[in-house]
Amino acid sequence: MNKEIARYLQKISVDSRFVSILEDRIVVNNLRYSRFSRAREEIFYHKFPEVRVNRSKVFQRIATRASRNLKAELKPRDRVALFRDGDCVSQTLYAVLEPYTRKYGIEIIQFELWGELEQLDVDKVALPFHLDCEVESLLEKMLNGDKISLESDRTSFNDHKLIYPLINIPRDWILSWTGSEGIPCTEDGSGGMAPEMVQFLSSFIPDVREKMYKSAQFLRENE
């Protein structure tokens, strides 16, 4: 179905490298580059009336930010493993990666149990790890008096290269998109003091997550 949709999009002059083709919807990653005008949308609906086209500005921001990491992390025809569950972050990660099956010709291989990973022939593992995960981990280390380090600095596991496409994406963006789309998924709940502190600080300090992440990067580079 996805290949059929991609071919038809090409036929009506829509660049499918800038849209995510999901089960029952198409999500625009970049409206300008995709050239998915309202007129082309109407033409598309004549062929695929059951597939909804979504132009979420939140998802376009997510895709644009994630692309900065993916440009450096992905190579043509990479085989990328992705953990499949009902989590909102994992579903967002799949939506972000899906266009790269056409941009770079990557293959996405989904798995349900971490024990399966050892049996997979893949080049990279894309982890559903976002900006709030990193910042909350930094705060936990600070509160415990531990050395400051970035979880996303871990780049390999059992000879598999690890990548973090959503590392600069806040949790709020992810939940805003999945919520507005009505995507059935579970939130990555994290309890404790650190998440509450991040929320508290964000009400006073603009872009506090990004600033904490950059500070940790600076410390790492200047050790």
Each model region followed by its residue ranges:
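Mid-to-C-terminal catalytic subdomains of enzymes
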Residues: K3-L9, S13-R17, I169-Q217
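Phosphate- and divalent-cation-binding pockets in alpha/beta enzyme and binding domains
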Residues: T92, E134, K211
